[in-house]
């Protein structure tokens, strides 16, 4: 493998770097596949029978735990995730193993059982946000942000699939969060970087790497962090990470945070056998030392500013009236939820966070919030796909069980035969987990799986 000019020389003095071992890891042909399970949608067994290796059988696929993530697993081979209905049901997320170290940063720096206000600043496509949503309590709130508009919709879809109701998806520049001064308990910034940590996984990334690009990324990372730090309260935690090996984007950013912004490093306890290297104020993942790709993470505590947000909100959605609540009641478990109306669309928000959700609508460009329950047409609810994916649906909603071939046809929006009993809206369910909606008519049923999500 031919690394970019100047790349290996730049790493020579970096903690844990071994030129020969690093090069060997990149020429080994090893491909690491890992997933993280969704605690909101537990599976009786993993891997499920629907997860198959191309040309193989289920028994060929074995798993082993990722030591720094309780719900993370390595897979012996990369199966066909696209044709596993349980992937589309949101029971697991395909994620790079090293980045799951976020779990240790959260567990060791904050009390995750307490009500927390968390911001995932650079969140698309959603790996860290779905992980954060699994880690924080039901009494917490997560703002999942992506500055690029098109990517914010991908983020929204993954948040919906994961099934929680305490997440707001936003599409804002980091500087916009200064409007929420001292609001967040935790800010996670997985900053855009030069991407050298992914060279083994994505060799084409080498063509874009240059020492000049590293400097540009470092400047951008400083701008992003300087813009968002006002939103972190005094005593709050900043978790900074990149998928770059370059010191300019890693240790030097840590030094800048301490020297220029008074941020205090938070040391994490990392067992030696994990193979993670402590470097400066952060932690490095080398592909010759860990089973994963290149990654860097550091934790800091803010020691200046106020401990509480003092702003007010102006924008308010209408609370659902008695007639609307009656139309929605058969569909959703409303305990602890507040139903709100935006034009003809009903949303369910956590009761505890209604005032805060209104604050986000007022201060941010909100793409999605809570659970989109459905649209009211002539006082009847047309259920939304997000409701099918959520974990707050009423227990007695009608459903039709699909076999594997039917489930795949459903996800492809192809025609298939299905014996149905009662008419009307029903969940299309595979292995007891919802995939979406069908509407059963006298002589047929209509498939309401979203066109933009269908598998090809």
Residues of each region from the PLM?
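Conserved class I S-adenosyl-L-methionine
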Residues: 113-124
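Mobile active-site "lid"/loop adjacent to the S-adenosyl-L-methionine
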Residues: 150, 185-227, 243-251, 269-272
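Conserved SAM-binding loop of SAM-dependent methyltransferases across substrates and taxa
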Residues: 125-138
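Helix-to-beta-strand junctions that scaffold the AdoMet/dcAdoMet cofactor pocket
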Residues: 137, 232-234
């Amino acid at each position: 493998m031919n690394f970019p000019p100047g790349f290996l020389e730049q790493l020579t003095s970096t903690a844990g770097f071994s030129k020969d071992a690093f090069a060997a890891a990149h020429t080994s042909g090893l491909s690491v596949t890992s997933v993280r399970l969704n605690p909101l949608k537990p599976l009786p067994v993993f891997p499920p029978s629907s997860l198959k290796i191309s040309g193989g059988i289920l028994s060929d696929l074995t798993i082993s735990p990722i030591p720094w993530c309780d719900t993370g697993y390595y897979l012996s081979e990369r199966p066909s995730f696209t044709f596993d209905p349980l992937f589309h049901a949101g029971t697991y997320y395909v994620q790079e193993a090293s980045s799951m170290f976020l779990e240790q940063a959260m567990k060791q720096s904050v009390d995750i059982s307490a009500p927390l206000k968390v911001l995932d600043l650079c969140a698309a496509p959603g790996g860290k946000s779905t992980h954060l949503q699994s880690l924080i309590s039901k009494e917490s709130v997560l703002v999942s942000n992506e500055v690029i508009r098109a990517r914010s919709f991908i983020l929204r879809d993954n948040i919906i699939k994961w099934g929680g109701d305490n997440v707001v998806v936003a599409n804002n520049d980091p500087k916009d969060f200064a409007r929420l001064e001292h609001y967040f308990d935790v800010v996670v910034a997985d900053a855009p970087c030069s991407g050298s940590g992914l060279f083994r996984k994505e060799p084409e990334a080498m063509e874009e790497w240059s020492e000049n690009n590293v400097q540009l990324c470092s400047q951008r990372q400083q701008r992003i962090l300087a813009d968002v730090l006002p939103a972190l309260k005094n005593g709050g935690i900043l978790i900074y990470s990149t998928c770059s090996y370059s010191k300019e984007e890693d240790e030097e950013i840590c030094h800048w945070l301490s020297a220029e912004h008074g941020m205090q490093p938070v040391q994490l306890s990392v067992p030696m056998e994990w193979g993670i290297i402590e470097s400066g104020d952060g932690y490095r993942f080398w592909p010759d030392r860990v089973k994963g790709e290149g990654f860097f993470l550091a934790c800091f505590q803010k020691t200046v500013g106020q401990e509480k947000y003092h702003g007010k909100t102006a924008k308010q959605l209408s609370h659902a009236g008695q007639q609307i609540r009656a139309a929605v009641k058969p569909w959703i478990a409303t305990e602890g939820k507040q139903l709100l109306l935006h034009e003809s669309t009903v949303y369910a928000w956590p009761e505890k966070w209604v005032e805060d959700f209104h604050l986000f609508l007022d201060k941010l460009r909100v793409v999605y919030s809570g659970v989109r329950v459905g649209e009211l047409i002539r006082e009847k609810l047309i259920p939304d796909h997000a409701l099918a994916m959520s974990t707050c649906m009423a227990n007695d909603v009608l459903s039709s069980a699909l076999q594997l071939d039917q489930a795949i046809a459903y996800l492809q929006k192809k025609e298939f035969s299905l014996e149905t009993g009662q008419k009307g809206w029903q969940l299309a369910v595979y292995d007891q987990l919802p995939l979406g909606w069908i509407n059963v008519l006298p002589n047929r049923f209509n498939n309401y799986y979203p066109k933009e999500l269908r598998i090809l």
